């Protein structure tokens, strides 16, 4: 295992080094390349970038995918992974690996769309819809944004309650305030600062959810065995559907196509070819990190919480971790949960703002977008007896919104008129169709089973 891991690291490092060298050597000729490819120059967020180049080549590689990746380690994922490991042990490890592989493809496709067209997915949707269609699409996207923020704010409120004993409603206010302050750095010359804040948060999340494995290392043989696809009864199939169905977050798809252009707000863009090469590395490393965190949560629960009762809620899981692994690990877990909430709710609001801009051509203040999605979460925290139930409801709402994001993405990346020579070939398009069909089918299954009272 150690030798394989080292070889993979060397290969990844070599790939990154080569990409950085390409970026440093290549003279950007963006407009010429777009014309030769048959692609419009666009009027998106990153259309007028003629400022000085980034000081370091790495700045043109890493960032956007790491911001999008926080959607994959939000409190909803924490709840799903901990529950899966506690109930079924290592059984569904293979589901997480498969889910992460699909995520890499989808997030890269979103980045590719933004790089080639110089527009975001919401902008492209808005250009192809009537006024009524744009408004209806925006309304469903806004409901999805509210459902997303619901889970993230509740998770943060629970973390503050576990760490400091704050009432859930007060904790929700604190999360809303801090995440709004973080959003001050989003956009313009401070966009890179915002990306770095999110990356630091992602590293805190990683440490928070992996620390327990150093205290109670898992059985490598059991982890490998979990890579073999199998189930144990209908309930485990439902759990797998929940994990896979929750893998792709609609707002992460919408946002990534914006992030790749916002990333260059403070510098000159490399060529499309170089951006695509850099984006592959960005997505691979970011989702490798996010996938590792998710796997660590499941393995931690499988190794230390398997068979224990009361682990079907985030606070119950934290108390069980504290009981089994000690208060230090329990506290570190809570800190990871807090970082997960703060980063994911900031990114969710960012996505909501870009969706509004792309579909309605309205540049609303970020604080206004923050208030719209925060208020429903605070209402739930004030009135609900069991806020964890809101996470389940929110997940179902998210499932409804996924087809509206992935299906247009699949169509646009195969559109030669839109993408020029960068359009997906037949083989890649077929693979993407299969992935999209699987994700949509699993989300429909999750919705139906939830409405039937079986989820």
PLM feature spans:
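Extracellular/periplasmic helix-exit of transmembrane alpha-helices
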Residues: 103-116, 260-264, 268, 288-316
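Hydrophobic alpha-helical segments and their helix-loop junctions in multi-pass secondary transporters
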Residues: 179, 183, 202-228, 237-258, ...
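Juxtamembrane transmembrane-helix boundary signature
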Residues: 68, 95-128, 137-143, 182
């Amino acid at each position: 295992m150690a030798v394989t891991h080292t070889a993979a690291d060397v290969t990844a490092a070599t790939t990154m080094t080569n990409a950085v060298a390409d970026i440093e050597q290549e003279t950007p000729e963006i407009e010429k390349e777009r014309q030769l490819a048959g692609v419009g120059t666009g009027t998106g967020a990153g259309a007028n970038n003629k400022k000085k180049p980034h000081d370091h080549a790495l700045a043109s590689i890493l960032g956007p995918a790491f911001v999008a990746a926080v959607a994959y380690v939000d409190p909803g994922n924490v709840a799903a992974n901990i529950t899966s490991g506690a109930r079924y042990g290592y059984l569904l490890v293979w589901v997480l690996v498969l889910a992460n592989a699909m995520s890499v493809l989808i997030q890269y496709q979103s980045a590719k769309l933004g790089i080639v067209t110089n527009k975001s997915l919401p902008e492209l949707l808005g250009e192809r819809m009537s006024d009524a269609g744009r408004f209806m699409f925006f309304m469903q996207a806004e409901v999805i944004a509210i459902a997303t923020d619901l889970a993230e704010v509740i998770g943060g409120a629970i973390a503050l309650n576990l760490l400091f004993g704050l009432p859930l409603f007060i904790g929700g206010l604190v999360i809303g305030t801090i995440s709004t302050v973080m959003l001050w750095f989003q956009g313009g010359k401070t966009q890179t600062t915002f990306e770095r804040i999110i990356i630091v948060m992602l590293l805190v999340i990683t440490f928070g959810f992996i620390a327990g494995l150093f205290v109670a290392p898992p059985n490598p043989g059991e982890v490998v065995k979990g890579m073999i696809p199998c189930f144990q009864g209908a309930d485990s199939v439902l759990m797998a559907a929940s994990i896979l169905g929750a893998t792709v977050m609609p707002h992460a798809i919408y946002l990534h196509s914006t992030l790749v252009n916002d990333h260059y707000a403070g510098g000159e863009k490399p060529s499309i070819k170089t951006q695509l090469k850099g984006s592959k590395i960005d997505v691979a490393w970011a989702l490798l990190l996010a996938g590792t965190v998710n796997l660590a949560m499941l393995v931690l629960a499988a190794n230390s919480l398997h068979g224990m009762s009361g682990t079907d809620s985030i606070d119950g899981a934290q108390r069980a971790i504290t009981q089994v692994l000690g208060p230090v690990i329990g506290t570190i877990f809570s800190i990871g949960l807090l970082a997960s909430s703060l980063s994911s709710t900031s990114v969710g609001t960012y996505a909501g703002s870009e969706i509004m801009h792309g579909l309605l051509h309205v540049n609303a203040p970020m604080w206004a977008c923050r208030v719209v999605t925060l208020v429903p979460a605070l209402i739930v925290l004030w009135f609900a007896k069991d806020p964890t139930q809101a996470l389940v409801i929110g997940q179902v709402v998210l499932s409804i919104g996924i087809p509206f994001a992935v299906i247009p993405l699949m169509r646009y990346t195969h559109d030669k008129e839109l993408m020029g020579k960068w359009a997906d070939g037949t083989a890649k398009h077929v693979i993407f169709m299969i992935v999209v069909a699987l994700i949509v089918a699993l989300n429909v299954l999750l919705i139906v089973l939830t409405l039937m009272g079986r989820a």
